[in-house]
Regions:
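Internal, conserved structured core segments that host functional sites
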Residues: 57-102, 108-109, 117-120
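Catalytic cores of processing enzymes, dominated by hydrolases/peptidases
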Residues: 92-198
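His/Asp/Glu-rich mid-to-C-terminal helical/loop segments that flank catalytic regions of hydrolases
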Residues: 200-238
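Short, small-residue-biased leader/transition segments that mark boundaries at the very start
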Residues: 1-8
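Short, glycine/charge-rich beta-strand/loop segments that flank catalytic centers
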Residues: 18-34
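C-terminal helix-cap and adjacent tail motif
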Residues: 51-65, 140, 144-148, 152-157, ...
């Protein structure tokens, strides 16, 4: 997903990682949801069946709310519009992502996907202080090996950032779907507090953006050096 600076994506590429950036605003279609996670309060003509907590919270594949529970729509959209978004935006992204993973497995015997997101500061408002700067999610050990998760955590903490694991975000559709550590495919979700690099109210970079970008680049350099290991004995029980 989106990096705070293009230099960070370029650096990852320089060190052998392949950056893949989502260009679709999450309020249009959420790529970290399943294509069937459709909210009947947003999309007309959908039966209210099999509602999971994400859909009930208004955070399905077509989100109903943004931060602080603010409504996106004043009326439901049609099922045809929702299906068009999913077909034109969701499916191409996931086809490309699956192809990259398959290519890595074919060439190197395994793959590591670091699914990076930024989160609004208020997403952590309910947590006790000091609040984390990053939240690492590996589905509580289900989407990545302990070794790889620990190395990612170490890279973040080495730059002085506070990190929390699997709470309040343990990973969603991407980690659940693509994380197969026993097949040497590891997925870790990294949520970073966007107030670290931008003024959220003014929607502009902070004055110390450059210093943050350098810290993030050092993290990405370490992450780009990670290697999957088919003999890794630290894979958590699924």
């Amino acid at each position: 997903h989106s990096f705070p600076t293009r230099r960070s994506a370029d650096l990852a590429l320089d060190h052998g990682a392949v950056p893949m950036t989502a260009r679709v605003p999450r309020c249009v279609v959420d790529l970290n949801r399943g294509p069937d996670e459709i909210d009947p309060l947003v999309v007309s003509g959908v039966a209210p069946a099999a509602l999971n907590p994400r859909i009930m919270a208004g955070l399905g594949v077509i989100p109903r709310v943004v931060s602080q529970g603010r409504a996106i729509y004043d009326r439901p959209i049609s099922l045809a519009v929702a299906q068009q978004r999913i077909e034109r935006l969701w499916h191409p992204y996931h086809r490309a992502l699956a192809a990259l993973i398959d290519e890595a497995v074919a060439r190197f015997g395994g793959a590591i996907l670091i699914d990076m997101h930024s989160m609004p500061r208020d997403a952590l408002a309910h947590l006790p202080r000091p609040r984390p700067d990053f939240v690492l999610g590996d589905r509580n050990g289900g989407s990545a090996s302990t070794r790889i998760t620990s190395e990612i955590a170490s890279a973040v903490q080495a730059e002085g950032f506070r990190l929390r694991r699997n709470s309040p975000f343990s990973g969603a559709y991407i980690a659940t779907t693509y994380g197969r550590p026993r097949q040497n495919v590891h997925v870790v979700q990294l949520e970073l507090d966007r107030s670290l690099y931008m003024n959220e109210r003014m929607v502009e970079p902070r004055v110390d953006f450059g210093a943050f970008a350098l810290r993030l680049e050092r993290i990405l350099k370490r992450l780009a050096g990670l290697r999957p290991d088919a003999c890794d004995s630290s894979i958590a029980a699924e």
